[in-house]
């Protein structure tokens, strides 16, 4: 312990705003030590001021869970409910720098009921620190968090096996947990996974090497975070893309289109196409807070003016004319369902994809994901915190892209139209080739049975399916889907019709 404290004092505090940035997420099951780890890391790199330490000591005596010692988790858990219950509820962000790198750390909750908050933190992360309690090993919530992080584009992970003191600093236990997670890491497609044994409370292998685990020859957590290469994860986008967030009209002489460039680069004179209208123009100016620029690229917030006026609204996408994508009205996506009421086929929601919005209908559920094995399993609905693959039909065409290719055009949320609650987070997996707006299926009754078609809306369940089989050459489910698009049924009955 004395060696750890002496080593910590040799770490000088720094603040380099121009250092390369790494966005880090901590995740894992409840009570695995996520907040304690980040708090201890902040302490070890001298990112905690003296008055903050005094306040921490006072709060530790009142709220702490470490007896007479400091409770470093309180540096992150700021809500009164978090301190009273000793848990993390909301996402806490911390910003700090070392000589090598600047960091944005997102401390996320481990409780299953706050999974939506964890997903929020994962949506912008480059690397995930997956905490595991050395006594309990890999839990279902550990696997769920790892899957969500990977689904949201995180390609690098640290397997932080914490509370090694409670496992006797056992190398065998460390190796056992690493082996438990190995199959999951392979299934998730992670590019790098580094396992580090820790005692976050005491600082072992956090920022300084532990003398209590001499068998471990790898880097400390901080050493790995400072050196991990995430530059190779940059998106490879063929052509310029800018979702329009605002049409700027400060006066009668200026009309510009503001947004953050999602990919590619743009220069004055470049030909662009506005989607979905397909109107063309050329870039006249690239305006920023620092004045006009000769060029702008991915991640730059700009306002573009054009050489002629065309109809462009918030939610449209400006794209390079030579590589413009095709707007679509159907998506295949992975959803994280975040509402108490289950997701059902046929339900309508408001879809928000960046600044663009559309009415969306769940057309089909392909499968749910088993969080234990990551294998698909049959499903007709998704319950709270379940993940699954679905097809979504839109009422109008939007510009979208697979999330793995363009994050800004591949992530969306679904909102309940009545409660205005966000009910799902989704990422686009694929764009079907025949992506057209949903329409009612054409039903072709025979001349003899034509009068009977008016009885169809009054039937339900198996009766609906049987009648549909008589009245059309199409499969019963196809017929009922078309009718459900144009007839006003109770939600439960419409779902019954589709599943009959």
What residue spans do the PLM features occupy?
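Conserved Switch II/interswitch segment of TRAFAC-class P-loop GTPases
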Residues: 101-103, 108-114, 123-146, 154-175
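C-terminal effector/interaction modules appended to NTPase cores
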Residues: 2-24, 29-35, 98-99, 250-452
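Residue-level signature of catalytic and energy-coupling elements of molecular machines
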Residues: 31, 37, 56, 86, ...
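Accessory interdomain/linker segments of ATP-dependent helicases and helicase-like nucleic-acid enzymes
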Residues: 201, 218-258, 273, 280, ...
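P-loop NTPase switch module centered on the Walker A-proximal segment
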Residues: 4-8, 12-113, 125
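Glycine-rich phosphate-binding loop of ATP-dependent small-molecule kinases
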Residues: 430-500
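Canonical P-loop GTPase G-domain recognition
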Residues: 167-233
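Active-site phosphate-binding and catalytic loops of NTP-dependent enzymes
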Residues: 63-66, 77-89, 184-193, 226-240, ...
């Amino acid at each position: 312990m004395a060696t750890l404290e002496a080593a910590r004092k040799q770490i000088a505090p720094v603040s380099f705003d121009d250092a390369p940035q790494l966005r880090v997420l901590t995740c894992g099951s409840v009570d695995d030590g996520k907040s304690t780890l980040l708090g201890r890391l902040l302490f070890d790199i001298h990112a905690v001021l003296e008055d903050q330490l005094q306040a921490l000591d006072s709060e530790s005596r009142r709220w702490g869970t470490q007896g007479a010692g400091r409770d470093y988790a309180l540096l992150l858990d700021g809500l009164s409910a978090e301190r009273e219950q000793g848990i993390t509820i909301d996402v806490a962000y911390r910003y700090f720098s070392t000589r090598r790198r600047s960091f944005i750390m997102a401390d996320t909750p481990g409780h299953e009921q706050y999974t939506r908050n964890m997903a929020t933190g994962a949506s912008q992360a480059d690397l995930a620190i997956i905490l595991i309690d050395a006594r309990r090993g890999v839990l279902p919530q550990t696997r769920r968090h790892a899957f969500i992080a990977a689904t949201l584009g995180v390609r690098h992970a640290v397997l932080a096996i914490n509370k090694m003191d409670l496992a006797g600093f056992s190398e065998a236990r460390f190796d056992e947990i690493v082996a438990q997670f190995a199959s999951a890491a392979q299934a998730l497609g992670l590019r790098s996974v580094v396992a580090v044994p820790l005692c976050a409370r005491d600082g072992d292998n956090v920022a300084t090497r532990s003398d209590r685990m001499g068998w471990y020859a790898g880097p400390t957590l901080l050493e790995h975070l400072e050196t991990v290469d995430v530059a190779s994860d940059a998106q490879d986008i063929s052509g310029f893309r800018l979702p329009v967030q605002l049409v700027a009209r400060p006066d009668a002489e200026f009309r510009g289109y503001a947004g953050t460039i999602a990919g590619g680069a743009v220069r004055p004179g470049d030909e662009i196409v506005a989607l979905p209208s397909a109107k063309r123009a050329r870039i006249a100016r690239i305006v920023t807070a620092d004045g006009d620029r000769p060029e702008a690229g991915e991640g730059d917030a700009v306002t573009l003016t054009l050489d002629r006026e065309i109809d462009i609204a918030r939610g449209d996408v400006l794209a390079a004319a030579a590589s413009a994508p095709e707007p679509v009205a159907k998506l295949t996506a992975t959803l994280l369902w975040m509402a108490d009421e289950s997701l059902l086929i046929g339900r309508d929601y408001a879809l928000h994809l960046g600044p663009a919005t559309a009415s969306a209908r769940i057309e089909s559920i392909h499968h749910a994901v088993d969080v234990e094995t990551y294998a698909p399993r049959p499903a007709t609905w998704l319950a709270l915190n379940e993940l699954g693959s679905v097809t979504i039909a839109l009422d109008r065409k939007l510009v979208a892209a697979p999330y793995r290719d363009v994050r800004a055009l591949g992530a969306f949320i679904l909102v309940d139209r009545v409660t205005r609650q966000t009910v799902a987070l989704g990422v686009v997996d694929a764009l079907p080739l025949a992506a057209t707006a949903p329409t009612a299926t054409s039903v072709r009754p025979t001349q003899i049975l034509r009068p009977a078609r008016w009885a169809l809306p009054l039937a339900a369940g198996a009766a609906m399916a049987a009648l549909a089989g008589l009245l059309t050459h199409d499969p019963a489910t196809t017929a009922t889907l078309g009718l459900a698009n144009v007839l006003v049924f109770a939600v439960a009955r419409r779902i019954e019709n589709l599943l009959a």
